[in-house]
Each structure stands twice: as C-alpha cells, then as structure tokens.
C-alpha cells in the first residue's frame, strides 16, 4: 500500500468537511419538514411582485421604515395558520388582526398570503411572514369560516394546518392584544409625516388659530348607498347624524376641527354644514389608494365614524373619543345575523341612533 502524502491527507480532510456540511443542512431541512416548517417564506421587507422561495435567517437587519423581514415566531409555537385575504383595506386589517390573535391563543404560527401582504405592507410595519404560493397549494389545510365575534370554540382549535376565512373585525378577537395590534398597524414614516403635515396646515376659519383638537370624520358612501337599503334594510350616515355627532364633540372639547374624509367627498361638501369654520374637507376620496385618508384619520385625536371596517380601524388606532352610527338597520334585517353591535363597537364608544324613517316608509305595504 502506498503511504498517504500530506497533500492527500489535506484533500481527504476537506472532503470530509464538505460531506459533513451537506449532511448538516439536509438534517435541518428534514427536521423543518417534520415539524410543519417545510415552508418557503417570503421575507416581507419589500413589496414582492414575483414571489420566490427563500429561508430567512434570524437577526436580519431592517430599516426603521419597513416590515419585519423574517418570521418572529417563538420556538414554542407549531403548525401553520393563515387566512384568506378577502375584501378591501379595512376587511384585510380585520383578518390580519384576527389571525394573529387566534394563532397566538392556540399556540400556532401565523402566516399571511401574498395578496394580504401587497395590501397592508406598503402602509404598515406588519411583521407576520408571508407564505409562498407553492406552499399554500401543497399544504393539507382544514378550512374554517369565522363569524364576526369571538366564540369559545375558537380558543381550542387543534388543527395544525388551518386556513381561516370570513370577514372578522371584532374587538372581541384581539382587544387583549391592543398594544401589539397597534404596533402591527404602525404607519410607515412617510405616511405619518404627510398626514401630520396636512393637520399642521389647518386653521380655524373664523379666528385663524391653529386647532388643538382634531376629530377625524369618516363618511362611508359608494357601494353602501345601494347595498345597505336594498340588501340589508339599513342606512348610511345622514347629514343629521353627522351634525349631531359634531355637536357632541363641540360640547365637550374646546374649538375642535373636523377633518372630513369620504369616498363621496362631493356629497360631504354639499351636505355637511361648514359655516362655523371648523369643518375641513381634507380627504381625497380615492378608493384605489385609501391609505392617505386612513393615515389622516389615525393622526387625529378623536373619531366620528359612520359604518364599515375602514372607520372602525381609524377609530381603534386613533384612540380618544369615538362616536358611531348605531341601530342602522331595521330589527328584522338579515345583517343582524352576521353582525353583533356589542362585538363591533367598544363599550366606551358613543352611539347615536340612525334615522330609519326612509326604511319604514319603504317597508309599508
């Protein structure tokens, strides 16, 4: 037998090192598959238009104005939960918050789908990781449609792979995590600064003074003008309701200014009394890019909302006093089967009853 040279020994040592490294990474990959982590994760530190499957490494640096780039799940969590991203901006905020809360409650890892990331990540510093489409399509999901209030059975869901659906937006799911939810829905700096710049430029009409108290007003119009009376036997916020809500704030706060946003700004200018000089029509009404109006509302001190999840989230994040439109459907409305007012509005919020006279007239034989 030929004696091994020093060169041969070095080559053999390098070969052993390479094989050991390959074996180590294969072990990690197989272990991740076995524990439900056979997932390709999209790092949501930027808007991804063509998702690719990558593994995020811990402690990846991120700028202060981006979403968290990698999963932040505690090691004790297991399984994989996600939720269908359905509806528009406010709907998807509700779905995100509910997924996060229920997954934590049940000790599961939460992931969002790329469509939800595309809706929310440009606006907020969200941290939930994104599930790659190929993983979504190959996972053996059990599906569960949620109703819009917390139920006891949702606290004990044993499914390791669960895909939720529905339009949950009730504080009963996530209010115990309010500070975490508010952190998830922190605006990116440029949106917050732009909104604050708009507010700084506002002046009270009669005195020219800079206001100290800002009341965000969200007036939902658009498709709800037909949907509410025709499908749900309901109404949207009227000019009389808005006047009463504004008077409520005028009676309790010194010289407030009302910052009006809506997807029907023309109606607002024609129907909201601005003669006192304290009403500012600041919204741009662009439904395709709602984040400017939303950012403006969240930077106000208080909120007047009409109906809809957009107004709910503006009020929830702004804090302060909130006035909402109450009893906006007839008692026999099918809407009340899927909507519980006590689960939709925080107990400390103030409700002003809607005027249903137009609906009673239509209901008469």
UniProtKB/Swiss-Prot annotation:
InterPro entries according to UniProt: Glyco_trans_11 (IPR002516)
Chain positions carrying an annotated carbohydrate: 65, 301, 327
Domain of life of the source: Eukaryota
Lumenal face of the membrane: 26-365
Enzyme nomenclature, EC number: 2.4.1.69, 2.4.1.344
Primary localisation category: Golgi
Residues passing through the membrane, by range: 9-25
Keyword Nucleus in annotation: no
GO cellular component term, pick one: Golgi cisterna membrane
Transmembrane helix as UniProt keyword: yes
Pfam families referenced in this protein's UniProt entry, alphabetically: Glyco_transf_11 (PF01531)
The reaction(s) this protein catalyses: a beta-D-galactosyl-(1->4)-N-acetyl-beta-D-glucosaminyl derivative + GDP-beta-L-fucose = an alpha-L-Fuc-(1->2)-beta-D-Gal-(1->4)-beta-D-GlcNAc derivative + GDP + H(+); a ganglioside GA1 + GDP-beta-L-fucose = a ganglioside Fuc-GA1 + GDP + H(+); a beta-D-Gal-(1->3)-beta-D-GlcNAc-(1->3)-beta-D-Gal-(1->4)-beta-D-Glc-(1<->1')-Cer(d18:1(4E)) + GDP-beta-L-fucose = alpha-L-fucosyl-(1->2)- beta-D-galactosyl-(1->3)-N-acetyl-beta-D-glucosaminyl-(1->3)-beta-D-galactosyl-(1->4)-beta-D-glucosyl-(1<->1')-N-acylsphing-4-enine + GDP + H(+); a neolactoside nLc4Cer(d18:1(4E)) + GDP-beta-L-fucose = a neolactoside IV(2)-alpha-Fuc-nLc4Cer(d18:1(4E)) + GDP + H(+)
Root EC class: transferase
Membrane topology field: Single-pass type II membrane protein
Ranges of the Cytoplasmic topological domain: 1-8
Span of the signal peptide: none
Pathway: Protein modification; protein glycosylation
A Gene Ontology BP annotation from the UniProt entry: lipid metabolic process
Keywords attached to this entry: Glycoprotein, Glycosyltransferase, Golgi apparatus, Lipid metabolism, Membrane, Signal-anchor, Transferase, Transmembrane, Transmembrane helix
Subcellular location: Golgi apparatus, Golgi stack membrane
Example GO molecular function: alpha-(1,2)-fucosyltransferase activity
Family: Belongs to the glycosyltransferase 11 family.
Function of the protein: Catalyzes the transfer of L-fucose, from a guanosine diphosphate-beta-L-fucose, to the terminal galactose residue of glycoconjugates through an alpha(1,2) linkage leading to H antigen synthesis that is an intermediate substrate in the synthesis of ABO blood group antigens. H antigen is essential for maturation of the glomerular layer of the main olfactory bulb, in cell migration and early cell-cell contacts during tumor associated angiogenesis. Preferentially fucosylates soluble lactose and to a lesser extent fucosylates glycolipids gangliosides GA1 and GM1a.
Protein name, entry field: Galactoside alpha-(1,2)-fucosyltransferase 1
